């Protein structure tokens, strides 16, 4: 899960901390923000469920007796120590040196035991499937479900990471020369630079909080990663009774540099399409056949040629006489080469030209392998009753990742939401991109599944944009990101009303209490009960327990994001978790204060172990 930034939106906080959710609509009638039509609040069962859940929930998230009832006194002490250490900036900044020194001084076995009883035990679900299953079952006893994430990554130096990135650069080129009469040269060049490997940003881990990073280590390793995802699916299936998710990163299943080229081709195609449609937004930009041919004629193209007819047939993907961007390629078609996916009409010659050129046969095969591995994981998960959550990554890789994910949703989300795409609210274009995807889902009739996060790559994204010379993709400040998050949630809730509760779902992945309260308010306002599986919450394992367990025990749908893997190989993850907690905890000490409050309460009342989930 992308890092969830913690902060206080004080007007919202005052609105909610009274312990009662207030809504602007009537208690009996809830209205859609875009239609004004009443939501269906007629189900007595769902109304009763909502009322009972809200009556059980302390919206201040300060009822420590309930929030930490799953923790033993030892676990409370461990959490306090770990979070306190994460708040000491000197220790956090030197955490890798400290860990390496401990490993050398203590020896492998004692070092491993020490970590399992401290940082590893607090932030990681376990090493083996059996250990993970025990944690999953314990969480479920307290109303919390699980998302499994195998968090092993190569422990390599920054120079080694850069070398892997530069060495793996694709020989393929995206040549948008055919677009020059339509798209201005500056736009084409800026796009090319943005989606090119730059050595100073070769280590994709730099300036990243929380998110795991994969570097390409050959096709055999990608096959191993696919099998690891399948093992995660098995673990979820055996322990969660069809309730769980597995987090998947597309960069684990193939060469990231191919995703970079694919992303450039997608964005250059968007540039061309926007120019053809007069600069319309992605969701608005649609042309009838008459408008299409008229526009080409205005550009001096002979419209009665076979090439133009073929081009129109390719971009009119559903044969409805309308051209739109979403049908311009078929990523998952195993019989179509990557070099053939993006055919662009050369305005000067009137002929079709491939946008991606000079792909070697080896690269073509690597891309097909990546697609096959992705589909293997998806189909295996569906067979086991487990859902897939595709993680978002950097903006220069995300167009390709999103396109692959949306194509998977088209293929596998016909009956229920098996595949979820991730949207990062700290990006300026998130609402527009999500709107375009929802429009396609509505038109084609498949389930739209979204995970909404704040984002994990802010520092790197801003530095890269400034150095290379393109617009900063990140919102200006925390408040703008919060506004984007809330706008996306509101828009999804309206889409639920428009399409029905079985066709749209969203996971609110956030540690921000105000964001969670906003989502809860939407559920009440739009009459969405927890059992309808439309809106759920998620937090990282070892963080924000006062929110997760309060929600779970009140009856809301909530998940913990569970990293797991061998101690030694999860150290890079633990290092980032320490860094993230350091930046968060120096601003907000609420969780630590609540843990200390609960420990003192137990000591004063003579309680020496966690209560069972069934006790009152």
From Swiss-Prot:
Instruction: Spell out the Gene3D superfamilies in the cross-references.
Output: 3.20.20.220
In which broad location class does this protein mainly occur, judging by the first location in its UniProt entry? mitochondrion
Induction remark: Up-regulated by infection with P.aeruginosa.
Q: What happens when the gene is disrupted?
A: RNAi-mediated knockdown reduces the survival incidence, results in increased bacterial load and reduces ROS production following infection by P.aeruginosa. RNAi-mediated knockdown inhibits the nuclear accumulation of the transcription factor skn-1 and reduces the expression of skn-1 transcriptional targets including gst-4 following infection by P.aeruginosa. RNAi-mediated knockdown suppresses the pro-survival effects of the addition of exogenous proline following infection by P.aeruginosa.
The leader peptide range reads none
Q: Which GO terms describe its molecular function?
A: FAD binding; proline dehydrogenase activity
Q: What is its EC number?
A: 1.5.5.2
Pathway, per record: Amino-acid degradation; L-proline degradation into L-glutamate; L-glutamate from L-proline: step 1/2
Q: Which UniProt keywords apply?
A: FAD, Flavoprotein, Mitochondrion, Oxidoreductase, Proline metabolism, Transit peptide
Q: Which GO terms describe its biological process?
A: proline catabolic process to glutamate
Localization: Mitochondrion matrix
Q: Which cofactor does it need?
A: FAD
| GO terms for cellular component | mitochondrial matrix; mitochondrion
Q: Which reaction does it catalyse?
A: L-proline + a quinone = (S)-1-pyrroline-5-carboxylate + a quinol + H(+)
- Pfam families found in the cross-reference section: Pro_dh
InterPro entries referenced in this protein's UniProt entry, alphabetically: EF-hand-dom_pair, FAD-linked_oxidoreductase-like, Proline_DH_dom, Proline_oxidase
What does the protein in this record do?
Converts proline to delta-1-pyrroline-5-carboxylate. Through proline catabolism, promotes reactive oxygen species (ROS) production and the transcription of skn-1 target genes in response to bacterial infection by P.aeruginosa.
Report the family membership: Belongs to the proline oxidase family.
- Put simply, this protein is called Proline dehydrogenase 1, mitochondrial
């Amino acid at each position: 899960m992308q890092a969830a930034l913690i902060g206080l939106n004080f007007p919202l906080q005052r609105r909610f901390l009274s312990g009662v959710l207030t809504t602007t609509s009537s208690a009996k009638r809830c209205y859609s923000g875009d239609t004004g039509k009443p939501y269906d609040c007629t189900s007595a069962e769902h109304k009763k469920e909502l009322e009972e859940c809200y009556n059980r929930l302390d919206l201040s998230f300060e009822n420590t007796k309930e929030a930490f009832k799953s923790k033993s006194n030892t676990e409370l002490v461990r959490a306090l120590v770990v979070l306190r250490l994460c708040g000491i900036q000197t220790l956090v900044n030197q955490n890798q040196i400290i860990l390496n020194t401990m490993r050398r001084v203590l020896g492998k076995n004692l070092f491993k035991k020490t970590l399992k009883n401290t940082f590893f035990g607090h932030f990681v679900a376990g090493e083996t499937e059996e250990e993970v299953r025990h944690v999953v079952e314990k969480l479920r006893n307290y109303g919390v479900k699980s998302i499994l994430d195998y968090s092993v990554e190569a422990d390599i130096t920054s120079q080694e990471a850069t070398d892997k990135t530069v060495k793996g650069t694709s020989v393929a080129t995206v040549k948008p020369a055919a677009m020059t009469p339509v798209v201005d040269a500056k736009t084409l060049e800026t796009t090319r630079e943005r989606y090119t490997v730059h050595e100073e940003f070769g280590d994709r881990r730099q300036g990243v909080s929380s998110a795991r990073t994969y570097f390409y280590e050959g096709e055999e390793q990608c096959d191993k990663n696919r099998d690891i995802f399948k093992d995660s699916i098995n673990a979820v299936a055996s322990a969660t009774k069809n309730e769980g998710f597995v987090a998947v990163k597309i960069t684990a299943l193939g060469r990231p540099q191919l995703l970079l080229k694919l992303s450039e081709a997608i964005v250059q195609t968007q540039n061309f399409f926007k120019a053809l449609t007069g600069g319309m937004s992605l969701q608005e930009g649609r042309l009838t056949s008459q408008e299409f041919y008229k526009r080409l004629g205005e550009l001096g193209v002979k419209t009665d040629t076979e090439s133009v007819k073929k081009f129109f047939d390719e971009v009119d993907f559903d044969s409805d006489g309308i051209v739109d961007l979403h049908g311009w390629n078929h990523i998952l078609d195993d019989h179509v080469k990557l070099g053939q996916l993006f055919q662009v009409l050369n305005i000067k010659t009137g002929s079709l030209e491939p946008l991606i050129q000079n792909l070697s046969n080896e690269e073509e095969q690597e891309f097909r392998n990546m697609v096959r591995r992705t589909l293997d994981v998806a189909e295996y998960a569906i067979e086991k009753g487990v859902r897939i959550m595709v993680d978002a990554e950097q903006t220069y890789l995300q167009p390709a990742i999103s396109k692959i994910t949306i194509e998977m949703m088209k293929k596998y989300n016909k009956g229920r939401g098996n595949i979820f795409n991730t949207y990062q609210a700290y990006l300026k274009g998130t609402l527009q991109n999500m709107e375009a995807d929802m429009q396609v889902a509505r038109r084609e009739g498949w389930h739209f599944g979204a995970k909404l996060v704040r984002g994990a790559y802010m520092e790197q994204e801003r530095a890269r944009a400034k150095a290379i010379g393109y617009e900063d993709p990140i919102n200006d400040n925390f408040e703008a990101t919060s506004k984007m998050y809330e706008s996306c949630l509101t828009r999804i809730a309206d889409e639920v009303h428009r399409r029905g509760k079985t066709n749209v779902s969203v996971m609110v992945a956030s540690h921000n209490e105000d964001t969670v309260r906003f989502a809860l308010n939407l559920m009440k306002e739009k009459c969405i009960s927890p059992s309808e599986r439309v809106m759920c919450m998620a937090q990282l394992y070892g963080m924000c327990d006062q929110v997760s367990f309060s929600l779970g025990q009140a009856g809301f749908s909530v998940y913990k994001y569970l990293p797991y893997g061998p101690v030694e190989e999860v150290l890079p993850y633990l290092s980032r978790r320490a860094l993230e907690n350091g930046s968060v905890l120096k601003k907000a000490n609420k969780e630590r204060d609540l843990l200390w409050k609960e420990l003192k309460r137990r000591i004063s009342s003579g309680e020496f172990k966690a209560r069972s989930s069934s006790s009152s």
